[in-house]
Amino acid sequence: MGEILGIARFRFDEGKLDEYKRLSAEAMEIVKTKDTGTLQYDTYLNDDESECVIIERYRDSEALMEHAANLEDLSAEILAIVTVVHGEVLGDPSAELRAALADSEIPQLFTPYASM
């Protein structure tokens, strides 16, 4: 077990960019003040601001699960105004994280194959 990476890509529903930006700012504040194992949490917008990519890095599976719990209510609000294009979790997850992801198509889990 070790670091876990997350990649999420959203397309904003029509007219929802400003609401997303407000919710994203709230999420960032929660991450900064409540998460204890989040190492990276970055949001990128494409040129026309119709989509975003979020890059997340966690100390371990427990940290990702803590993050998900901290953002649970806010995540529901965000998911109500976006279409999920894709989501991936990369790493060697704990049994608990693997179980939490088991019934979900998104995010898709990728485990290590080769790295340097």
Residue locations for each model-derived region?
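A generic local structural motif
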Residues: 73-75
